[in-house]
């Protein structure tokens, strides 16, 4: 068990598993990326923000959490891009309400001339809501699913995800999927 390990002990690690986010292709239009992080879903998105910024892609980050003390990675995101916005359900920090409400607000106040790609990780309800908004606006939306991955190699079938092309495994085929490919519960 990991808690019994001491500094210098050796451990076996399996990973990373599955696939990650796909960065925008170079196109004639100037792409922009909107990263939306809900709760602990912020952690896997920091590196993405850094990579997008390195590629000179305009990047906006939206972070949502229940309360101020549950906001994660804000400083890390701000190192990658100056455009970081926060919302809390209870209004203790940033905008009050769900991050999806903040997403609507940002879309109304930012230029729409950009090809927009949305990257999102967080609770399932938030993912579905953001995916619906993206579908309405015809934005590409990539979601990182927070599924329980017991074995991590596709044997246990504990992370089955329903898609338009049949069942897939979050550990092998994901955890990142195009939102339009998923069948939401």
Walk through the language-model features, giving the residues of each.
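FAD-binding FR-type
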Residues: 1-34
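Short beta-strand segments
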Residues: 14, 36-37, 62-64, 121, ...
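Histidine-anchored nucleotide/phosphate-binding helix
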Residues: 44-53
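Intrinsic disorder/low-complexity segments
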Residues: 23-33, 54-56, 105-117
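Reductase modules of NAD(P)H-dependent flavoproteins
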Residues: 66-110, 114-185
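Residues at the starts of beta-strands that form the adenosine-phosphate
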Residues: 10, 32, 57-61, 83, ...
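Extended, positively charged loop/linker patches that create polyanion-binding surfaces
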Residues: 38, 48, 147
